[in-house]
Amino acid sequence: MTVVAFSLARFTPADLSDFYEIARPRMDRGLWAGVTRQTSADGDQLLVTFPHLDRPVFRFKRDRRGTYTLWFHDRQGWHSIGSGSTSTECLSIWRTRPARVTPPAQVREAY
């Protein structure tokens, strides 16, 4: 039997699942217009577009070393906003966190 090694430059099914868990609600609410995948020998990337914009705004990439990077594009160019050795780590900036609630005793003391 021949076993073919999975390329470090490609997203795994788990990586895609992590990404689409974040993307689907944003697309359903109309915040994101679409996601396009581009694959090459140098890496795999998902490009996120916003409604009424003709260019991608976010890029989630896995390079040939297996490193994940999340990029944001403003009018000045691409800026890294996250990176990690796993997709979960890299995408953590988009994970919702529970709101911080100040205990009632501290609120009263502040006044």
Feature map (PLM): residue ranges:
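Compositionally biased amphipathic helical and low-complexity segments enriched in hydrophobic
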Residues: L47-V48, D54, W71, S92
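Short aromatic-glycine-(Arg/Gly/Cys) micro-motifs in beta-strand/loop hairpins
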Residues: L53-H79
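Assembly/interface hotspot detector across virion components, adhesins/toxins, and nucleic-acid enzymes
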Residues: V35-T39, F60, W71-H73, G84
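Mixed-charge, Lys/Arg-enriched low-complexity segments
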Residues: M1-F11, F72-Y111
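Negatively charged, low-complexity tracts enriched in Asp/Glu with abundant Ser/Thr
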Residues: M1-H52, V107-Y111
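Intrinsically disordered, low-complexity segments enriched in small/polar residues
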Residues: D28, W32, A41, R64, ...
